[in-house]
UniProtKB/Swiss-Prot annotation:
Keywords: Cell membrane, Membrane. One of its GO terms (cellular component) is plasma membrane. It comes from the Eukaryota. It is found in: Cell membrane. Required for mesendoderm differentiation. Interacts with glucose transporters and promotes glucose uptake. Probably augments the glucose uptake capacity of glucose transporter proteins to meet the energy needs of mesendoderm differentiation. This is Small integral membrane protein 43. It is a single-pass membrane protein. Interacts with glucose transporters SLC2A1/GLUT1 and SLC2A3/GLUT3; the interactions may promote SLC2A1- and SLC2A3-mediated glucose transport to meet the energy needs of mesendoderm differentiation. Residues 15-21 are annotated as: Important for interaction with SLC2A1 and SLC2A3. GO terms for biological process: mesendoderm development.
Amino acid sequence: AITAGALQPGRLSVHREPWGFSREQAV
């Protein structure tokens, strides 16, 4: 699921999974 967040923009990621959004911001 984290991979999906990375593929999608942070804004969309935060909607699906907050941790994925945070991870992309850190990276």
